[in-house]
């Protein structure tokens, strides 16, 4: 029945109804010149060639030829929505950030959800981490929290980032997804065990974007009005309840409704079923960080909720769909270096790398003036600096104000109260190898204590079902890493691989051994 159609399916109909009795606008060129005919090109005679003076055609085609912008290297497929963040608990003892300044304060936000490895046209229901990035339009500039639906990540050293992403993408010759690439990297870098185990658990395929938690993942630093700092992690827990999709259903949806998650989010908001999340922090003092048994800045590990309990802060609600996807989602750009006073980076190596990488890729993808785009603009504060010109400068370029600093003409000046907090660092500069920094203990806890028996069985089945596509020597190396976590983990996956491999003999390959991290070596250090 037509009356049963989803709001997303009826978007065009609803747009027309929203105009009421308004007459159609006059069709124009990009320069605003009215157009008399949009169906027929201007030619010399009914069968003749086109005329160069047909500016209706050239204006249309020239713009069409330039519609596409570079696709995001990662997080290419996504959905977005707007809403607000509301403070429900006072945390001013930890942070002076105005976004937290009093209970009841609300701040506009925009959120982008995404898959990670797939291209813009890939299915929503693949086994993949989900991006969960939040932009807060605060009184003191934008705060971008670039999170995921997982509290950990695959690597802890940012220098590995390009190679890790390459391993998850397509083979450079065949242009196919390659299990050898994926598992070769993971098995050579056993710090990935924690995230890989989470990925192949039930939570590896969340039911849309509304039924999953989010995490800032990185370690950050909060500073209060007295200049006292603490380290923190950010968590946002779904108020819709955790729901995941079984493998068979995910495969079916990938074929029949590849945009399942985008559709689900859009329709929920359009129907007034606004999704929300409760926002928490974990706090660790500098003294606790010095004495903690693990590196508190290691992105492959979590902070124990028993030692560092969740502290409620607020909630955020998504209550508006984008008016235009390209303008408000495709051009949406998150930068973890956007931190208002009271929120600062920690020594987290992955965060440090992303402070450069994220804005750098936005300048490539959107241009030097991407922060002038309405969705990225810090519209709740006044931007005043000495940056000028560049492609697509869309405002007054700061008029006649001086474009150099310092100057004697009352142009923007610094305010010492906004100086970053002091911090101590090691004087010993080197390339520190952290490959064997206990890659197994927290994974063992996840396998034996977080998961129940049915979940452990599904984890092993999911992992073996993907690992079977890799070469035998890669399978063997990965199982050795799992054995270092727990013998039951390794034995289960090996038994399933033996069954898969018996069904089709693998090609034998000869390889040269390479130096790499070893989960077994890490276990032996415990």
UniProtKB/Swiss-Prot annotation:
It is found in: Peroxisome matrix. Catalyzes the degradation of hydrogen peroxide (H(2)O(2)) generated by peroxisomal oxidases to water and oxygen, thereby protecting cells from the toxic effects of hydrogen peroxide. Homotetramer. It holds the Pfam family Catalase. It catalyses: 2 H2O2 = O2 + 2 H2O. Belongs to the catalase family. Gene3D superfamilies: Catalase core domain. Its EC number is 1.11.1.6. Residues 1-22 have a biased composition (Basic and acidic residues). One of its GO terms (biological process) is response to hydrogen peroxide. Residues 1-29 are annotated as: Disordered. PANTHER family: CATALASE (PTHR11465:SF9). GO terms for molecular function: catalase activity; heme binding; metal ion binding. This is Catalase. Its cofactor is heme; NADP(+). The active site is at 75, 148.
